[in-house]
């Protein structure tokens, strides 16, 4: 094999990364660049799309140097990205008409309220699988069209293009030749019919968004175009693309119905592959596209917890109880339990399955005997309790009782958290040897598209489990602990 490597571009909320993988899925080299976060008003979050491109393109150049390889050695590039973040740009000059509006930004709440008043909430859920919320791209696009001078007129003349970050990167990598997205990213816009896999005319009319600005939707594993790194060397295929959480699902090889993964980052994102059926949640979860490849679509149920690792950051930065996130395991293990203390980290409300923006954080069960160790342990347990909430909702929606869950993200290095997650859910927790599963998913999609790997069956033999955590507590204790959590949550709402 003359081409020995795949490069994954992992464009995240705070940094851009590039990782080189070899045929055995081992990491050869990586590069990372952070970029600016902008908060022009309370609740608003923006990025400079040109800075994102500069950071991502520089990591691509740097990672080749670190791996000591040339473009001729690279079979393909795969892309994974922060989802929902919205860019609108001039198709001739390539200049954005406004900063990228980030998925966290809440500025379009009034637009959501207007759409709810028009009675569109149920149609949006049935068509897109999403809740009507500023989180998703559709209302962000509308805000730009309605509020940036001259932009709507230019869009209606066919002068502008829209894209989520995947689309923006492909357009830049191909020097403006390719305007494309994949089903996983399209499914996060609130404009895409996940059943027909088409942009939805009724929603485009309701949002008043011209179809001409939208990208073409192609499979998650396909050759979209070619790029030359820094304008030099041979052309490399851009051949795989998926939103970050779906990419992690694929990187964990959760490719069959009933398989699930939980990513422990700033928040927690739990996705379960539901196969060819788009299961409509009755318990506060999102219905989304898991992957679109091999001529078909697999769907997923998704639940998000707002405060995962961010809860540990709060312990460190606001309370000063720890110096480093890694310290939490040491302190948590110094006590047998939390002494009845529950921390409900509803600092920005509660996500799935509650969707309660007005809930606020609380420490429940404090007594004179409670100490730092109990509070730190309660913070870690809260991450696992919230994931149990999601797992229970998924089991009810899918009628599938999960036996195993694969995990990834920074917090999975915490053995205490992983063991408690297994204990409180009564589910086996599998921690992979390689936890860079988001980037690995993009690499898999690209490699499969160009024949670097023959099939997902081949990939299964390369995916190793570093450790599995099995439930160790009795059902009686599990039920008692979780009942205490549920009672504590009611006090925050």
Swiss-Prot record:
Record's keyword annotation contains Transferase: yes
InterPro entries on file: ATPase_NBD, Carb_kinase_FGGY, Carb_kinase_FGGY_CS, FGGY_C, FGGY_N, Glycerol_kin
Pathway: Polyol metabolism; glycerol degradation via glycerol kinase pathway; sn-glycerol 3-phosphate from glycerol: step 1/1
Activation/inhibition comment: Inhibited by fructose 1,6-bisphosphate (FBP).
Binding residue positions for ATP: 13-15, 266, 309, 313, 410
One GO location term (cellular component): cytosol
Binding site for glycerol: 83-84, 135, 244-245
Domain of life of the source: Bacteria
Nucleotide-binding is among the record's keywords: yes
Record-level GO BP terms: glycerol catabolic process; glycerol metabolic process; glycerol-3-phosphate metabolic process
Record key words, sorted: ATP-binding, Glycerol metabolism, Kinase, Nucleotide-binding, Transferase
Molecular function as annotated in GO: ATP binding; glycerol kinase activity
Residues that hold ADP according to the record: 13, 17, 266, 309, 410, 414
EC numbers for this chain: 2.7.1.30
Family annotation (HAMAP family): Glycerol_kin
UniProt family annotation: Belongs to the FGGY kinase family.
Name of the protein described by the UniProt record: Glycerol kinase
Gene coding for it: glpK
């Amino acid at each position: 094999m003359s081409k020995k490597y795949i490069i994954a571009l992992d464009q995240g909320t705070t940094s851009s990364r590039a990782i080189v993988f070899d045929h055995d899925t081992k990491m050869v080299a990586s590069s990372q660049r952070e970029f600016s976060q902008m908060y022009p008003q309370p609740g608003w979050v923006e990025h400079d799309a040109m800075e994102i491109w500069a950071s991502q393109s520089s990591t691509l150049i740097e990672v080749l140097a670190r791996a000591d390889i040339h473009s001729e050695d690279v079979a393909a590039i795969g892309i994974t990205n922060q989802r929902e973040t919205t860019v609108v740009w001039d198709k001739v000059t390539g200049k954005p008409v406004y900063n990228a509006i980030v998925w966290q930004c809440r500025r379009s709440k009034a637009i959501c309220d207007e759409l709810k008043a028009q009675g569109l909430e149920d149609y949006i859920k049935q068509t897109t699988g999403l809740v009507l919320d500023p989180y998703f791209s559709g209302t962000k696009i509308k805000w730009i069209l309605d509020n940036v001078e001259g932009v709507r007129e230019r869009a209606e003349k066919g002068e502008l293009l829209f894209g989520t970050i995947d689309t923006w990167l492909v357009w830049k990598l191909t020097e403006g030749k390719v305007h494309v997205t994949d089903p996983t990213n399209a499914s996060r816009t609130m404009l895409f019919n996940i059943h027909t896999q088409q942009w939805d005319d009724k929603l485009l009319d309701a949002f008043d968004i011209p179809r001409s600005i939208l990208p073409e939707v192609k499979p998650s594993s396909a050759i979209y175009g070619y790029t030359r790194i820094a304008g030099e060397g041979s052309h490399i295929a851009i051949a795989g693309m998926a939103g970050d959480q779906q990419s992690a699902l694929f990187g964990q090889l959760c490719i069959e119905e009933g398989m699930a993964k939980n990513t422990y980052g700033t928040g927690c994102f739990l996705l379960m592959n539901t196969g060819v059926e788009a299961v409509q949640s009755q318990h506060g979860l999102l219905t989304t596209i898991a992957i679109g490849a091999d001529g078909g679509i697999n769907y997923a149920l998704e639940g998000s917890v707002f405060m995962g690792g961010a809860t540990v950051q709060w312990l460190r930065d606001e309370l000063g109880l720890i110096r480093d996130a890694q310290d939490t395991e040491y302190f948590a293990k110094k006590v047998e339990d939390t002494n009845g203390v529950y921390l409900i980290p509803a600092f920005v409300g509660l996500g799935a399955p509650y969707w309660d923006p007005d809930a606020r954080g609380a420490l429940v069960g404090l007594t004179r005997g409670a100490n730092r160790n109990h509070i730190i342990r309660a913070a870690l347990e809260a991450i696992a309790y919230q994931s149990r909430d999601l797992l229970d909702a998924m089991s009810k929606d899918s009628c599938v009782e999960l036996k195993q869950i694969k995990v990834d993200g920074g917090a999975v290095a915490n053995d205490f958290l992983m063991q408690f997650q297994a204990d409180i859910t009564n589910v086996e927790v599998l921690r992979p040897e390689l936890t860079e599963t988001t980037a690995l998913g993009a690499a898999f999609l690209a490699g499969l598209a160009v024949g670097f790997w023959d099939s997902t069956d081949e990939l299964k033999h390369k995916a190793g489990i570093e450790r599995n955590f099995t439930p160790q507590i009795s059902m009686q204790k599990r039920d008692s602990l979780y009942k205490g959590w549920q009672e504590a949550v009611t006090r925050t709402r």
